[in-house]
Amino acid sequence: MNSKIKTAVKALVSTMFFIVLMTNAATAQEKDKATEGAKVVTTQMKSQLALNDSQYTKVMDVNKTFLQKAAEAEKGTTNATEKAKKIKMFTDERDSKLKSVLTETQYKTYTANKAAYGKKFREFYQ
């Protein structure tokens, strides 16, 4: 009986270890996807908005943070209304941060192209 318990405990520990390992791998993939998406959108923004190097770095950080939060909301929320509220909140947060980084002219161009950026962002968090 004692050896059966030891075997069961070993199997349980092995299974738990495997689950933790897979969860960490999935989280790393989500972060990589957020980084990739932020690079794609920020590079597009750099050419359309004529961002300087300092702005590019700040916009990249803002976009990456947005994508990480949006992906978490997409994955962690089953209610469509709640999900939409969270994405709207994260979008407003991103816009506010971008407004402080961009010039007035750049921000106007950004808002004119916002739908296209949003479509591109969705490719990376849905």
Language-model segments: what does each one mean?
Residues 1-33:
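Bacterial Sec-dependent N-terminal signal peptides
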Residues 2-3, 27-126:
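Charge-rich (acidic/polar
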